[in-house]
Amino acid sequence: RDPTGCEVDQVIMVKRHGERYPSPSAGK
């Protein structure tokens, strides 16, 4: 398996989580 694909998958998951659960430091 390509390590790059794993990294991309993690980034996508993080982005999704950020959208669903925005960090308190986001501003709102």
Swiss-Prot record:
Chemical reaction(s) catalysed: 1D-myo-inositol hexakisphosphate + H2O = 1D-myo-inositol 1,2,4,5,6-pentakisphosphate + phosphate
Region of interest called Disordered, as start-end residue ranges on this chain: 1-28
EC annotation from Swiss-Prot or TrEMBL: 3.1.3.8
Gene3D superfamilies, sorted: Phosphoglycerate mutase-like (3.40.50.1240)
Cross-referenced InterPro entries: Acid_Pase_AS, His_PPase_superfam
Top EC category: hydrolase
Gene Ontology MF annotations: 3-phytase activity
Keywords, in A-Z order: Hydrolase
Active site, per annotation: 17
Role noted for this protein: Catalyzes the hydrolysis of inorganic orthophosphate from phytate.
Stated family: Belongs to the histidine acid phosphatase family.
Protein's UniProt name: 3-phytase B
Species of origin: Aspergillus ficuum
